[in-house]
Amino acid sequence: MPLSVGQGYFTSSISSEKFNAIKESARLPELSLWEKIKAYFFTTHHAEALECIFNLYHHQELNLTPVQVRGAYIKLRALASQGCKEQFIIESQEHADKLIIKDDNGENILSIEVECHPEAFGLAKEINKSHPKPKNISLGDITRLVFFGDSLSDSLGRMFEKTHHILPSYGQYFGGRFTNGFTWTEFLSSPHFLGKEMLNFAEGGSTSASYSCFNCIGDFVSNTDRQVASYTPSHQDLAIFLLGANDYMTLHKDNVIMVVEQQIDDIEKIISGGVNNVLVMGIPDLSLTPYGKHSDEKRKLKDESIAHNALLKTNVEELKEKYPQHKICYYETADAFKVIMEAASNIGYDTENPYTHHGYVHVPGAKDPQLDICPQYVFNDLVHPTQEVHHCFAIMLESFIAHHYSTE
């Protein structure tokens, strides 16, 4: 079969004949009786997939923008079964992209051209200008990027899987990620950036510190200790840590020392296990998120962000003295986000409000809006940035890593 949608045992196939019928039809196809029965008892996303295919074939008649067309293509890829995702190929050209879906034999079953909108991803273009790509990056024997983090770094949808595809399930979140596309971890490890294998333990909701069983949320979510316990250290890894925001924003903890010390203890564990390269990242200024700006705890969030980063940086300096043969660096995430926010403001992006106020959960029976992959907003929701901001962050971080970990 050309395309299978759904996951695990709950899959549904879309034949090449169905593709052709959708292409020739002026109306959105209806589900067959058997397809309706499967959709009723199992979540196959068959109807959503057919709608995406219809929108792709008929984007001109529907007056869809290039962003909406790309959104339909990305959503269809997210709905496709795991073994079919390699059938989706984007061929980039000078003024347009060709969006392709192939069958099992490598033949095109869908191929459309979409122009590159000059205003799309304007923020990423600005950051690219100020942070030109480093040339001839050589990271020595580093072959893997290993990530420990929370929803900012969760590229595998770990919280999505843990909550049985509930958090986040709203249409403005892509493939179980807490953003409207890809995360900075995926960009950074991709062939267009550092081109390294990615090993990602990050999970949405994760905290830096461990909390007692008397705290139900603390018991449910992951933390640095649990993530590190799942990891087998290697001297060929660059271990990257970005945690702490949920301790202050989600669990409303204020023991900065406990939050930082837990992270440092776990960093020492992997160093003892053989890791030679570590990058420790501070948290963004939590008071600058739409949630923080309108919260009664705005000042508290700002103070905690500053205190956390100052203490974390001091501890990293102590680690560098304790392990002089290792490459251990601290990255000021808050400064990077300030640069991105300023650039966004200068070109007219909304830096104050979230793109969506809906929340994380899809309401059964409701029709979610089309996924927008590049709105001119810094924040996709009240606390999480858009994928474009993730891309900008990866651009800046690539320059930092090239400068501090390169062997040339």
Swiss-Prot record:
Q: Known CDD domains for this protein?
A: fatty_acyltransferase_like
Q: Per the record, what phenotype accompanies loss of this gene's function?
A: Mutants have reduced cholesterol esterification activity as well as reduced lipid droplets.
Q: Which UniProt keywords apply?
A: Host cytoplasm, Hydrolase, Secreted, Virulence
Q: What is the effect of changing residue 151 to A?
A: 5-fold decrease in deacylase activity. Does not affect translocation by T3SS and cellular localization
GO MF term set: cholesterol O-acyltransferase activity; glycerophospholipid acyltransferase (CoA-dependent) activity; lipase activity; small GTPase binding
Q: Which family does it belong to?
A: Belongs to the 'GDSL' lipolytic enzyme family.
Q: Which NCBIfam families match?
A: PRK15381.1
What is the protein name given in its UniProt record?
Answer: Secreted effector protein SseJ
- What species is given as this protein's source? Salmonella typhimurium (strain LT2 / SGSC1412 / ATCC 700720)
Gene of origin?
sseJ
